[in-house]
Curated annotation (Swiss-Prot):
<feature type="transmembrane region" description="Helical">
    <location>
        <begin position="218"/>
        <end position="238"/>
    </location>
</feature>
<dbReference type="GO" id="GO:0046677">
    <property type="term" value="P:response to antibiotic"/>
</dbReference>
<keyword id="KW-0812">Transmembrane</keyword>
<feature type="transmembrane region" description="Helical">
    <location>
        <begin position="87"/>
        <end position="107"/>
    </location>
</feature>
<feature type="transmembrane region" description="Helical">
    <location>
        <begin position="149"/>
        <end position="169"/>
    </location>
</feature>
<keyword id="KW-0961">Cell wall biogenesis/degradation</keyword>
<dbReference type="GO" id="GO:0050380">
    <property type="term" value="F:undecaprenyl-diphosphatase activity"/>
</dbReference>
<dbReference type="GO" id="GO:0005886">
    <property type="term" value="C:plasma membrane"/>
</dbReference>
<dbReference type="GO" id="GO:0071555">
    <property type="term" value="P:cell wall organization"/>
</dbReference>
<protein>
    <recommendedName>
        <fullName>Undecaprenyl-diphosphatase</fullName>
        <ecNumber>3.6.1.27</ecNumber>
    </recommendedName>
</protein>
<keyword id="KW-0997">Cell inner membrane</keyword>
<keyword id="KW-0472">Membrane</keyword>
<dbReference type="GO" id="GO:0008360">
    <property type="term" value="P:regulation of cell shape"/>
</dbReference>
<feature type="transmembrane region" description="Helical">
    <location>
        <begin position="1"/>
        <end position="21"/>
    </location>
</feature>
<keyword id="KW-0573">Peptidoglycan synthesis</keyword>
<keyword id="KW-1003">Cell membrane</keyword>
<keyword id="KW-0378">Hydrolase</keyword>
Length: 266
């Protein structure tokens, strides 16, 4: 990859990873528009690591508080709102781990194509609109509870289907279950940490076994750009949804789905 490709792909990853608009739908566009080849396993690890650093640093205070409370709940039996939230995040992670392990080969072989991504981009965009408009949206993140956390976790597992959007699916489920927009977004962001960390470790293990040459300059640049873009994305996304809701992202998803359909059928 040349420097221009690194910048564009890292920006796409950083800007779309935490927005409810599907990063996979965007990463397929350069291939469709410009004929770019797959960026490779090492670059995937780099840009995902940049996004992971962004969410960890942005929510560092919440994560540190949750971690300490979680440790206290294990070794001292002290339960608090933050320890419960930590356990709910862990519980919500399990469905994606389970179904990801079972279905990853099937998904990669049969579902990772432009047709599936176009359909899921539109369908789950409409579901996000419905959830945002019709749900009660009055619960805080500390009122999630284990049942709601598990259901949101199943939504995250559903997002293994390309084009669905992990953040889009989890926010849609959280809104349907009564969480406020801010709570739905924060729970989704916090859920991304164990999932992204686990994915980075698994892909990193595959990379360690690979004998392909590694362009370290491209990896460092991609990681930095992805980090900056993802950090800014989280910050401004929380501001946008507090003022305008999910409608701008629904409209964007529908437009993106139409563009993808145009490439497929015309």
């Amino acid at each position: 990859m040349d420097t221009f490709q690194v910048i564009i792909l890292a920006l796409i990853q950083g800007l779309t990873e935490f927005l409810p608009i599907s990063s996979s739908a965007h990463l397929i566009l350069p291939a469709q528009l410009l004929g770019w080849e797959d960026q490779g396993l090492s670059f995937d690890v780099a840009v995902n690591t940049g996004s992971l650093f962004a969410v960890v640093i942005y929510f560092r205070h919440e994560l540190w508080t949750m971690f300490n409370a979680w440790i206290a709940s294990i070794f001292r039996g002290q339960q608090s709102e933050d320890s419960k939230l930590a356990w709910w995040i862990i519980l919500a992670t399990l469905p994606a781990v389970f179904f990801g392990f079972l279905a990853k080969d099937f998904i990669a072989t049969h579902l990772r194509n432009a047709e599936v991504i176009a359909v899921t981009t539109v369908v789950f965009g409409l579901l996000l609109w419905w959830a945002d408009k019709m749900s009660r949206r009055d619960l805080t993140v500390y009122q999630t509870g284990w049942r709601k956390a598990l259901l949101i976790g199943f939504a995250q597992a559903l997002a293994l289907i390309p084009g669905t959007s992990r953040s889009g699916a989890t926010m849609t489920a959280a809104l349907m279950l009564g969480l406020s927009r801010d709570a739905a977004a924060r729970f989704s962001f916090l859920m991304s940490v164990p999932v992204s960390l686990g994915a980075a470790i698994l892909v990193g293990k595959d990379l360690a076994k690979s004998e392909l040459p590694i362009d370290y300059q491209a990896l460092i640049l991609g990681t930095l750009i992805s980090f900056v873009a993802a950090y800014a994305c989280i910050h401004y996304f929380l501001k946008i949804i507090s003022r305008m809701g999910m409608t701008p992202f629904v409209i964007y998803r529908l437009a993106l789905g139409a563009v993808l359909c145009g490439f497929i059928f015309f």
